[in-house]
From Swiss-Prot:
<comment type="function">
    <text>The alpha subunit is responsible for the aldol cleavage of indoleglycerol phosphate to indole and glyceraldehyde 3-phosphate.</text>
</comment>
<feature type="active site" description="Proton acceptor">
    <location>
        <position position="49"/>
    </location>
</feature>
<comment type="subunit">
    <text>Tetramer of two alpha and two beta chains.</text>
</comment>
<dbReference type="GO" id="GO:0004834">
    <property type="term" value="F:tryptophan synthase activity"/>
</dbReference>
<keyword id="KW-0822">Tryptophan biosynthesis</keyword>
<keyword id="KW-0057">Aromatic amino acid biosynthesis</keyword>
<comment type="similarity">
    <text>Belongs to the TrpA family.</text>
</comment>
<dbReference type="InterPro" id="IPR013785">
    <property type="entry name" value="Aldolase_TIM"/>
</dbReference>
<dbReference type="InterPro" id="IPR018204">
    <property type="entry name" value="Trp_synthase_alpha_AS"/>
</dbReference>
<keyword id="KW-0456">Lyase</keyword>
<feature type="active site" description="Proton acceptor">
    <location>
        <position position="60"/>
    </location>
</feature>
<protein>
    <recommendedName>
        <fullName>Tryptophan synthase alpha chain</fullName>
        <ecNumber>4.2.1.20</ecNumber>
    </recommendedName>
</protein>
<dbReference type="InterPro" id="IPR011060">
    <property type="entry name" value="RibuloseP-bd_barrel"/>
</dbReference>
<dbReference type="Pfam" id="PF00290">
    <property type="entry name" value="Trp_syntA"/>
</dbReference>
<dbReference type="GO" id="GO:0005829">
    <property type="term" value="C:cytosol"/>
</dbReference>
<keyword id="KW-0028">Amino-acid biosynthesis</keyword>
<comment type="pathway">
    <text>Amino-acid biosynthesis; L-tryptophan biosynthesis; L-tryptophan from chorismate: step 5/5.</text>
</comment>
Amino acid sequence: MSRITTTFAKLQEEGRKALIPYITAGFPFAAITPSLMHGMVEAGADVIELGVPFSDPMADGPTIQKAGDRAIANGVGLVQVLAYVREFRQKNQTTPVVLMGYANPVERYDQIHGKDRFVDDAAEAGVDGLLIVDYPPEECEAFAAQLRARDMDLIFLLAPTSTTERMQQVARVASGYVYYVSLKGVTGSGALDTAAVEAMLPRIREHVSIPVGVGFGIRDAATAQAISRVADAVVIGSRIIEMLDGQPHEKIVPLTIDFLRGVRKALDA
């Protein structure tokens, strides 16, 4: 059983919802990522999504694109991201870590380091799941099986526009949780319509038996609390990155802890 599945089972037993913060690895400073991850856990994060910097992130809005550009300028790529996870695992062996990114860096990693090397290296580093935005579920059965053999999960996005066929395809290969993108468009865009999310989640659950996390557009504790009434997990990314942009090194971790503690308190209320 994966760390992600174990975490969600424990939360369900306790009647609690998962808090999943997202941060782009290597943003805003290259060396701060492991400390930031530990701070997130201290504040009540249940799973951490770590964005892999990429030069052409088609699903990301301006905030996360800018963070990715900064991380790349800081010299951070997939090799360094795995190093951050290894460092995090020296002190924390329980909190799941999901890498979120695109196919290109993964495929380049295997070209440079050897066929299927990325999965082996990610498992060895302590990664628990992958969310590869541009991997189509209908072509991922072998890859998903390869991950499951290493107790890793393959996570997929669903959107307001997702068809029944898409949901069924995702249900066949996904494990850990699915990530419902609550807005049309890119990350960080628009205002969240909680009623629309409430209407969509039962449709998803007709086809998907694993937990459903909701993200894109969750910017404060009140919205997170409203979404948590219908979702199994709340994902917050762009708001954290906006908050940290331009802040000095010494404020990065305390600001993140303070913000996430407020969200955690709202989820547990």
